[in-house]
Swiss-Prot record:
The organism of origin for this protein: Mesobuthus eupeus
Signal peptide: 1-7
Tissue localization of expression: Expressed by the venom gland.
Domain LCN-type CS-alpha/beta: 9-73
Purpose of the protein: Alpha toxins bind voltage-independently at site-3 of sodium channels (Nav) and inhibit the inactivation of the activated channels, thereby blocking neuronal transmission.
Family: Belongs to the long (4 C-C) scorpion toxin superfamily. Sodium channel inhibitor family. Alpha subfamily.
UniProt keyword annotation of Nucleotidyltransferase present: no
Keywords: Disulfide bond, Ion channel impairing toxin, Neurotoxin, Secreted, Signal, Toxin, Voltage-gated sodium channel impairing toxin
GO cellular component, one term: extracellular region
Compartments in which it is found: Secreted
Record GO biological process: defense response
Lineage: Eukaryota, Metazoa, Ecdysozoa, Arthropoda, Chelicerata
Name used for this protein in its record: Sodium channel neurotoxin MeuNaTxalpha-6
Residue span(s) of the pro-peptide: 74
Amino acid sequence: LMTGVESARDAYIAKPHNCVYECFDAFSSYCNGVCTKNGAKSGYCQILGTYGNGCWCIALPGNVPIRIPGKCHR
């Protein structure tokens, strides 16, 4: 049993101001790099998702910001 571990979730990783990391190639390694650099197990480019084309992370740590409903304030 592990203690003190933040919960992980699958979600769009967010930049500051509630914006997704945009991507344009579902087969690129860009999103996997962004996600794993932030502690996720993996990631990929979700094309035409809820927030357009954005990086979706698998098992992203709970302390990393995710895209939430509302505007992206660039």
